[in-house]
């Protein structure tokens, strides 16, 4: 009897009965609750290692995957890649699930449990057959069209690296600016995730999925989206090698302001709540990157504080913008502050302009002055455990922010 891995708590638990009815044995195990303190990439790596150990010691035939957070789901998928065990992702309506549908793992048609049991019996397709350059391009475009933010780039880069796909960071830089969020939900309302993927049209590659070829699972025709929404734009500092991912609404040409520098998310939240940040400020928040977090912090608390204060100001960080971020966010600043990046040498009052049209970083401070400033200090030791090992070995965000 085939054995199917089912993680809990997740929506996969609802499919246990269907797995048994299809003639397979569900192997239910709870996701780790005691995660190391850190950001989304650190949690992803922890879940990947945990799932790999469990699955490799339990003679499983396939995996039925679901999780509450994209980081956890990406970790489970990375474990499937390491073991090359057939995997099916339970489809949901969130942007990361739409990306995984375009990648080939979340079925656009059929019952996820029945598909997982069929894959367990046949052994195909395996994750190594699904993850390749064209399917990753599909996933990137579909995820961004459905409203995903920069976190999608990080997890897809980690999946690409695990699969041995070369050149994905360069693909991100080319395709992301060409892939705006769909403004208006007509494709999704008409046909769900399949409609949203189908609206990509000729940009979509007909890649292999858990239910056959991708285009064979799509409706045709689909309603055209109403308009182009926000998109991701890369800006760079030529001399410093700085690179920043900006979220730009249609028609916005720059992100600018006088810097208010904060050395952590906690400091930034305090500054917002105390009224120390004004409407002319650009809030700079550092120490949140892969090494500084450690693990790449998503600034959800700061996003909440800004909403509570009804303060619509731009934010620049070496971490991640919060989910459903509104306004101008510039994130994943690389090199991060703890790696000597320019973002860690900015100071209160510096005039900063991120030119979204030219793709350039412009500052009122001279380059020599910035270089002469004290760099952002290395974080205090994260101890001797998993987080410390991660902080020592982590890769940059657009390379997946995994272990190097």
Regions picked out by a protein language model, each given a short descriptive name:
Residues 1-32, 37-43, 73, 79-84, ...:
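Catalytic or ion-coupling anion/metal-binding cores of large enzyme and transporter domains
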Residues 6-7, 55-76, 89:
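A short, small-residue-rich loop immediately preceding and capping a beta-strand
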Residues 46-58:
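Short, well-structured alpha-helical segments in soluble
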């Amino acid at each position: 009897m085939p054995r199917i891995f089912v993680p809990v708590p997740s929506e996969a638990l609802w499919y246990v009965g269907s797995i048994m009815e299809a003639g397979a044995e569900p192997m239910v195990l709870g996701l780790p609750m005691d995660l190391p303190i850190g950001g989304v990439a650190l949690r992803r790596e922890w879940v990947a290692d945990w799932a790999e150990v469990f699955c490799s010691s339990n003679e499983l035939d396939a995996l039925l995957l679901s999780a509450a957070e994209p980081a956890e789901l990406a970790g489970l998928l990375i474990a499937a890649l390491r073991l090359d065990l057939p995997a099916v992702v339970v489809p949901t309506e969130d942007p990361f699930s739409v990306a995984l549908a375009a990648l080939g793992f979340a079925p656009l048609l059929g019952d996820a449990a029945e598909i997982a049991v069929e894959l367990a019996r046949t052994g195909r397709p395996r994750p190594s057959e699904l993850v390749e350059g064209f399917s990753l391009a599909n996933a990137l475009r579909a995820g961004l069209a459905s409203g995903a933010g920069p976190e999608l780039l990080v997890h897809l880069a980690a999946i690409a690296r695990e699969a041995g796909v070369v050149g994905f960071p360069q693909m991100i830089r080319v395709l992301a600016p060409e892939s705006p969020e769909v403004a208006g939900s007509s494709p999704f309302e008409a046909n769900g995730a399949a409609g949203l993927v189908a609206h990509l049209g000729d940009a979509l590659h007909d890649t292999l999925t858990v239910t056959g070829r991708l285009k064979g699972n799509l409706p045709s025709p689909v309603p055209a989206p109403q308009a182009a929404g926000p998109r991701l734009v890369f800006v760079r500092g030529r001399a410093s090698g700085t690179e920043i991912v900006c979220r730009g609404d249609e028609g916005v040409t720059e992100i600018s302001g006088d810097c208010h520098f904060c050395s952590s998310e906690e400091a930034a939240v305090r500054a917002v709540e105390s009224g120390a940040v004004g409407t002319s400020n650009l809030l700079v928040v550092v120490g949140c990157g892969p090494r500084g977090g450690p693990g790449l912090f998503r600034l959800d608390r700061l996003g909440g504080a800004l909403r509570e204060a009804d303060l619509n100001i731009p934010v620049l960080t070496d971490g991640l913008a919060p989910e459903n971020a509104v306004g101008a966010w510039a994130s994943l600043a690389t090199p991060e502050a703890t790696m000597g990046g320019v973002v860690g040498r900015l100071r209160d009052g510096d005039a900063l302009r991120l030119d979204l049209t030219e793709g350039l970083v412009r500052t009122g401070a001279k380059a020599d002055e910035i270089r002469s400033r004290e760099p952002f200090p290395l974080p205090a030791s994260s101890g001797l455990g998993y987080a410390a090992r991660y902080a020592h070995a982590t890769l940059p965000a657009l390379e997946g922010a995994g272990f190097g």
